[in-house]
Amino acid sequence: MEQIEFDYTQPINDEWKKIMEKHLRTAKTFEIHCWNEETTWIEYALKYGTLKNDDWQYGKNIVGLVSTDFVNMVLQLPKPKDTEIYNKMTPFFSIFLDNGFSSEHYGTELNQQ
């Protein structure tokens, strides 16, 4: 796995969005992970996918197709304001794409397999 370097301490998420856009272009499916208490974001992600049946007791996984609507949603998300623990780039804890790309820990870690 190769870590993609970028400055996740930025006050805006433009660089994160630019990297996401590049990788979304070649992806066909996604999987989003949210913690159980992130109900607003679980409901939001469910507009673009369905709940994956798994045994993760601490959260929910949403899977779906990388459609134009999904890409637009990801790229138009505002940078979260709750940045005390993480300087969040996205409200989603993890976003995995079928092309091996992942945005983890609220977008502070980007990886490519």
Describe the predicted segments one by one.
Residues 1-113:
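Structured alpha/beta or helical-core interaction and ligand-binding surfaces enriched in interleaved
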